[in-house]
A protein has these predicted regions:
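Membrane-embedded alpha-helical bundles of multi-pass transporters/translocases
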Residues: 2-459
Length: 459
């Protein structure tokens, strides 16, 4: 493989665009697909919850399988991960659009079948993009500060998308507090095209620099089950997987209820656009400030300290409901700063877990380690997405009613704030007691790896 240029800002921007490209389809679907199913296709939220639980569970199982395929793919001069991103970006975009076709005139069973097919095929295509993209950062550099930068820049991609979609979505997708079916399809097409373009930039601007082919004999097969056994001993990976799982379940359920909170509790879904505009400020503060606080306190330490603050604030809100949506938006934004460490730094924790894997076994297995982590994220998304739909049904949401009753609104507030507290509190506790890589231990691990690599080179 020809010599590549040194790590630079071009790599960071390329990686940002990669996350933006992934978010353009995945996060748009995460935010609006369940809403589209219930408000446009008029599907019972219980059935939506079951559909998402089944398909996401399959998708979670699919992630390690794709990870194994990626790891078994040899670098033939074009990179180990880039070819996957290039090939599967287009079908991912197409399937995203098909998911928002208005089939409300279909028979109820046909609607369910269409939802199931488009949902699960999209997830397979997206997995073939997301696993290699997530693994890509671990082979772009082995410098700890550059990896932190990549994690920060990756979060910036998602932040850019969320900022735009949270502002534009409520203004474009709804009229008079009711959904406009054709606008969902239009916005999905816009997001899909932008996502495809961004991923093409990623495949050209990001360079793979750490080349570690599997150390096996020619006739030895890739032992998938041995790798799975190895990663179960990776305490760093287990810690970040469990912490993320719990946090995502809580936060995902909250996000799934967000539109209903503004639409049915505050009575104004369009005001979510104000939240989107203010999120630019919160995101910039988190993006700029996280680098310095993580360097000073350590990644694990900062995530725990700041998230605990947000948990306390939301615990107070649980007992003292707010009626002013603008006040809620401001308080929620401040709390976002507290939990932003989970978003901004989590991928740096995963990269550290890959190093921990190499330290323990001598093999990095980036694809499987990353996909194992993503397996738990997918399971969490499956649980949170389905549980959000179940929570709507339990709270008394009426799918055929344009305006919900007051009892539903009251239950919604308690559910929203309570899930936030429980989710992030448990995530912090798991990170504290299971994830072993403090600031000092991370430095020791990286030094040990450097010594081993130098010794191997000397031989």
């Amino acid at each position: 493989m020809k010599e590549t240029r040194p790590f630079s800002m071009k790599d960071k921007i390329g990686y940002t665009l990669g996350d933006l490209g992934c978010c353009c389809t995945e996060q748009f679907r995460a935010m609006y697909l369940a809403i589209f199913y219930t408000l446009v296709l008029k599907v019972n939220p219980v059935h939506v919850g079951i559909l998402m639980l089944v398909t996401k569970f399959w998708d979670a199982i699919n992630y390690p399988l794709i990870g194994a395929l990626v790891d078994s793919h040899k670098n033939k001069g074009k990179g180990k991960f880039i070819p996957w991103i290039k090939f599967f970006a287009f079908p991912t975009a197409v399937l995203c659009i098909l998911g928002f076709v208005n089939v409300s005139n279909f028979a109820y069973g046909a609607r369910i079948a269409y939802m199931f097919i488009t949902y699960i095929v999209y997830e397979i295509m997206y997995t073939c993009v997301n696993v290699p993209f997530g693994s890509l950062s671990s082979v772009m550099t082995d410098d700890v500060n550059q990896r932190t930068d990549l994690s920060r820049f990756r979060s910036l991609g998602g932040t850019i998308f969320m900022t735009v979609i949270v502002i534009a979505g409520p203004l474009f997708l709804y009229k008079d507090n009711q959904p406009v079916p054709s606008h969902f399809l239009i916005m999905s097409a816009i997001c899909a095209v932008i996502g495809l373009i961004c991923l093409m930039f990623t495949s050209h601007w990001c360079k793979e620099r750490i080349i570690t082919e599997p150390v096996v004999e020619k006739k030895e097969k890739f032992n998938y089950f041995q790798v799975i056994k190895d990663i179960t001993k990776n305490k760093a990976l287990l810690g970040v997987m469990l912490s993320s799982f719990i946090g995502i379940v809580g936060a995902g359920m909250v996000n799934g209820l967000n539109t209903y909170l503004f639409r049915d509790y505050f009575g104004n879904v369009a005001i979510m656009a104000v939240s989107g505009m203010l999120s630019v400020l919160w995101s910039l503060i988190a993006f700029v400030g996280t680098k310095f606080v993580a360097k000073k306190f350590g990644k694990k330490e900062w995530i725990m300290y700041s998230a605990t603050f947000s948990v306390v604030v939301y615990a107070i809100l649980f007992f003292f409901p707010l009626e002013n949506p603008l006040l809620f938006i401001i308080i929620n934004g401040i709390c976002y700063l507290g939990v932003s460490g989970f978003q901004v730094l989590v991928w740096a924790l995963v990269n550290d877990a890959i190093d921990y894997q190499e330290l323990q076994t001598g093999k990095r297995n980036e694809g499987i380690v990353y996909s194992a982590y993503t397996f738990f994220r997918k399971l969490a998304n499956a649980v949170s997405g389905s549980m959000s739909s179940f929570a709507l049904a339990i709270a008394g949401f009426q799918v055929n009613e344009a305006v919900q009753n007051e009892a539903f609104s009251g239950h919604l507030w308690k559910t929203y704030t309570g899930l936030y507290v429980v989710g992030y509190l448990l995530a912090v506790l798991v990170l504290k007691f299971i994830y072993p890589l403090t600031k000092e231990k991370t430095a020791e691990m990286l030094q040990d790896l450097a010594d081993k690599r130098n010794a191997t080179t000397a031989e």
